[in-house]
Amino acid sequence: APMLTISEEVQKRLQEKSYKIVDSVQVIGGCNVQWAHDPKTDRDIIIEINPRTSRSSALASKATGFPIALVSAMLAAGLTLADIPCGKYGTLDKYVPDADYVVIKFARWAFEKFKGVEDKLGTQMRAVGEVMSIGKTYKEAFQKAIRSLETGRYGLGHAKDFDTKSKEELLKMLITPSSERHFLMYEALRKGATVEELHDITKVKVWFLEQMKELVDEEEALIANKGALPADDALIAAKKNGFADKYLSQILEVPEQDIREKRIALGLEEAWEPVHVSGTQDKAYYYSTYNAEDKNPISEDKPKVMILGGGPNRIGQGIEFDYCCVHAALALKQLGFETIMVNCNPETVSTDYDTSDKLYFEPLTLEDVLSIYKKENPVGVIAQFGGQTPLNLAADLEKNGVKILGTAPAVIDLAEDRDLFREMMDKLEIPMPESGMAVNVDEALAIADKIGYPVMVRPSYVLGGRGMEVVYDPENLTKYMNAAVGVTPDRPILIDRFLNHALECEADAISDGTHAFVPAVMEHIELAGVHSGDSACIIPSRHISEENVKTIKEYTRKIAEEMGVKGLMNMQYAIENDKVYVLEANPRASRTVPLVSKVCGIRMVPLAIDIVTAELTGRKSPIADLKEKDIPYYGVKEAVFPFNMFQEVDPVLGPEMRSTGEVLGMSRYYGEAFFKAQEATKTELPLSGTVLISVCDKDKEEVVEVAKERNIPIRVGVNSGSLEKEILAKYDGHVTADGIVESAMDKVRIIEELNYDNIVVSIKSSDVMMCVKAHELLADKTGRLLHIHDLLHGHRKHLFGHIYAGNIQSPLSKNGRH
């Protein structure tokens, strides 16, 4: 926005038609009208109308400063547009958009989280988040959007291996729209493709392709002097066109710091322009540009604190962290600080102009954050509430003289360094699974051979289990290491012994550096190996012994105090054979902070703000006044998954997070709380149907015990071994066989012969990979995507077994059973 390639005549015509439609439908409030325009025939076709605020409403509000939802509420309450004041226009009915900047929305995808899915864009939405950027020109805004995505890219060139491909290969890859389309077009232009060729294939407007071609030509001219800093005029032009310091450093192969120092020496620094907010005065909402004079007055009335937001929503980092940032801003205001928010996500509350005293709609990169810090000179920056994004910046910010409030960046590094962390656990006499760090295949194989398979492997400094896998043998470990990207001595692969039959749990804590308070221990419902963000969890725990709960809280306090954590902290644990093991420490706000705050009735973020600002306010730590309390109800968190958008993907869960949201069910009865959570996910709950249970030999009797305990007659397809016959004989009258199968192929035959309308495949096995392979075979042969749920292990079956294997037509009673 604004429209750059649509004539004013067409824009006016579509606007007038939209007004007629809205008047005819008699919409009061926000409305979204979508059009298609054929530039060849000049024909307009209406696609759809949404008589409500929509996803684009939030984007439009942030792009224009026009508070659509607020105005919609006023109109719904009976006001008219002529009643609502609107700044220089007088009243809202006279408002005309007149922005003198360019706004770009760029979607964030997560295809890497869904193995086997084709990166293909179409009529069904597949983005999991988005960023918005603002610039004085299209080029400036577009390049700013790329570095806002936080995909490790700071410009359009040299993405993946695209620069090694020929022009013909790139043009072929462009035939199918994908999330990489812009990066492919950039490299195709570099390899000699013409604007006309790209237009013929992609149908992208020629003007946009010409803008991209100019960026390619400018980059090639810069690369001609690789190894040296660019000439003054070339650097000035590059910055005006949106080239980031980091990207210039990469393509020129010179240190980013040298680029920055030369730029500052030239007086080439970001200026700040306001986004005018309709109907309000003095709302401080700014964007950066190298193409205008600075119009950002600085106040000195109050001490300032800068909060770094979470960037774009994606799997592993979502609105849970925005919750923390918003509550941090509100708490800081109450303490008398001027709050400065930095974020680039239009979907969030943190980027509302009235959440903080001053909003910078900017990428969360070192260059952009340092520019804001230099401009505002705050007393400190808070990096612990925005997830992994600001944490990854914290160390570099500190090196550049930025005061980080709360937990020190060195503590963050300590938590990620498995060797140092293990030394600390040994000192505290806290058990931890055997582990190690590797930067190559040989090191990884040696570590795995020492600690034994299966092992859990993951990159360091990631969120959401990105790249995390359970590996069962040397062959697959070798494949994993060979495929790993960005592995360095500073960013090694972490390898831990996988606790195969463990019950996983976690605890959030508030710490002042010397004392810590743990409000709750959360019990994970899924088995070990499922990422904590994907697992349902319950507060308070149902099956962790009181002794182990005390142990977990004590371990958490000892670790927080030893590390000197100031603020929030999350600890992950596993319990195997009644022994508590530490899995990892996260000295920051976690995605469970909103959950614990709501279920336990504790204001975790404001309490953390009291602690991290104590050196500035002189206020005493609140930890001593916090007391544990009994919770007379249950809260169950359940994850929400996007498998409806990725129907070719097997929905089996694992150590890499794939959920995009979560819900909370609460009740005095734990079974009812769980059921509420399932309903809240909007996943269709089958009221009848057949359950096909596939388990390994050692678990078969246990599965039947679950069914028998619930008094549920079950029909099974069993193997023809002696164990199956013994089970059938032992539970005669309770278990009936629909067929005796010799192989996985025969299981498919049973499904086909019985013509099940609703199949739930319940798998519980210590060999997760075997289960996955069997399920894939069933799905392939039946042509259906089957839903997988883990049958709950051991003592946990009493809590939720009935949801998966029971007659869910029966109303839940007070004890949470049928």
Model features per residue range: what roles?
Residues A1-I223, A228-A234, N241-G242, L266, ...:
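ATP-dependent carboxylate activation and anion-phosphoryl transfer catalytic cores
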Residues V33, I404, V455-V457, I493, ...:
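Hydrophobic faces of well-ordered beta-strands that scaffold small-molecule active sites
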Residues E347, A410, F498, C696, ...:
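Active-site beta-loop-alpha junctions enriched in small/polar residues
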Residues D357, E367-P431:
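Conserved N-proximal alpha/beta basic substrate-recognition cap immediately N-terminal to
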Residues T407-M468:
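A conserved helix-loop-beta module that forms one wall/lid of the active-site cleft
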Residues V518-M522, L527-V530, I712-G721, A744, ...:
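Non-cysteine beta-strand/loop elements that form the S-adenosyl-L-methionine
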Residues L728-H818:
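Catalytic alpha/beta core domains of metabolic enzymes, predominantly
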